[in-house]
Amino acid sequence: MSGSSARSSHLSQPVVKSVLVYRNGDPFYAGRRVVIHEKKVSSFEVFLKEVTGGVQAPFGAVRNIYTPRTGHRIRKLDQIQSGGNYVAGGQEAFKKLNYLDIGEIKKRPMEVVNTEVKPVIHSRINVSARFRKPLQEPCTIFLIANGDLINPASRLLIPRKTLNQWDHVLQMVTEKITLRSGAVHRLYTLEGKLVESGAELENGQFYVAVGRDKFKKLPYSELLFDKSTMRRPFGQKASSLPPIVGSRKSKGSGNDRHSKSTVGSSDNSSPQPLKRKGKKEDVNSEKLTKLKQNVKLKNSQETIPNSDEGIFKAGAERSETRGAAEVQEDEDTQVEVPVDQRPAEIVDEEEDGEKANKDAEQKEDFSGMNGDLEEEGGREATDAPEQVEEILDHSEQQARPARVNGGTDEENGEELQQVNNELQLVLDKERKSQGAGSGQDEADVDPQRPPRPEVKITSPEENENNQQNKDYAAVA
């Protein structure tokens, strides 16, 4: 009974197979594990569908299954063995590759480690100190454009490895300095010597960048910096700095300063406090700026000659003026002289002031006289023009109806004569009233005053006769 029950339980378990499937002709595909369950995969066609979904081959659906070594084609599901390797292909033929070695990690052989431990041997090995080795610092040069004495020099850092490539050095110089002629093709020293390779470049020196044009030999060194500090080899400090002009320290010698410091140290037994590093750097920066200013002043004094004729007199004769005759001055030559060199002129300020005072007094007297006249005979002065206007209006009114009514010219002339007589009487009265008080003063004040015009009324016929007489005279 027990044997039959074991057989029945064994037959009732489903059959499950696991295989590794590769792609046909793909040497980089490591394979895909596919599980074949008896209940789910009942036929070979269903197995092909499962492999198609698992492999996802670029050629499409899987139609054939091959063995990896010989390429034998499998046609039934029973031929597949659990744990085996197979190749899935489409309609194409089998491609023979070493599928079993795809994706396998090759293990390196283990190195034999020597288990013996040697004792430490103490020995003195002579090795040069690291600080003594020269550092590969970049080469620092200062560049000046050809013919440029105004702009300051530009600083350029060139790596040591780049010095062997001269074209690359010229390219770096072109990027640093812009020339009108274009790129930089040559480098010259300040003396005009051509630099042909990077090995000739010296650290901390000045060079002139030249393009396609020729080198312009100008006093670059005199105008930009002092010659004493120009040629100093790299890594060597200056032995002594020039004294600062105008400072108290430059007046005394170094021995005096040393003696003062020793005396001060003997007097004061207490130690002096240490100064901060920042203050020391500030003092050094101030000294450097003063030194630069002194160098510029010294260079400017060297370039400008100290002569009595000044800077406006040329030092040498020009080629254009060679052989030309000098034009001599004569009496007609006009020379502009400054104001402080002109002869003094005497100005009659007193006479002009007296004349101005007299004119002002005369004006004041005349204005006062007019004011008195207006106050005294204000009513008469205001009535006189009104009387004249009334007489004129009356005469016009009388003259118009006479003409209209057909009066004769003799009657009109008599009426005009009467009007003129009346006007003359009014003017005479006015003159007498004004001349009684200030007739003499007015004559003294303004002797050249023109007489007042007399008002005379003429008839239209007289005007026509006068016009005809003038025309006859013009024709004659």
Swiss-Prot record:
Expressing tissues: Ubiquitously expressed. In brain, highly expressed in the entorhinal cortex, inferior temporal cortex, medial temporal cortex, hypothalamus, amygdala and hippocampus. Expressed in liver by cholangiocytes, the epithelial cells of the bile ducts (at protein level).
Gene name linked to the record: DCDC2
One GO cellular component term: microtubule organizing center
Ranges for domain Doublecortin: 17-100, 139-221
Positions of the UniProt region annotated as Disordered: 234-476
Function, in words: Protein that plays a role in the inhibition of canonical Wnt signaling pathway. May be involved in neuronal migration during development of the cerebral neocortex. Involved in the control of ciliogenesis and ciliary length.
Location of Phosphoserine modifications: 270
GO molecular function: kinesin binding
Localization terms from the record: Cell projection, Cilium; Cytoplasm, Cytoskeleton, Cilium axoneme; Cell projection, Kinocilium; Cytoplasm, Cytoskeleton
Pfam families, alphabetized: DCX
Quaternary assembly: Interacts with DVL1, DVL2 and DVL3.
Disease: Dyslexia 2: A relatively common, complex cognitive disorder characterized by an impairment of reading performance despite adequate motivational, educational and intellectual opportunities. It is a multifactorial trait, with evidence for familial clustering and heritability.
Basic and acidic residues bias (residue ranges): 279-289, 354-366, 446-455
Key words, A-Z: Cell projection, Ciliopathy, Cilium biogenesis/degradation, Cytoplasm, Cytoskeleton, Deafness, Disease variant, Nephronophthisis, Neurogenesis, Non-syndromic deafness, Phosphoprotein, Repeat
Residue stretches of biased makeup (Polar residues): 261-272, 296-306
Record-linked PROSITE patterns: DC (PS50309)
UniProt protein name: Doublecortin domain-containing protein 2
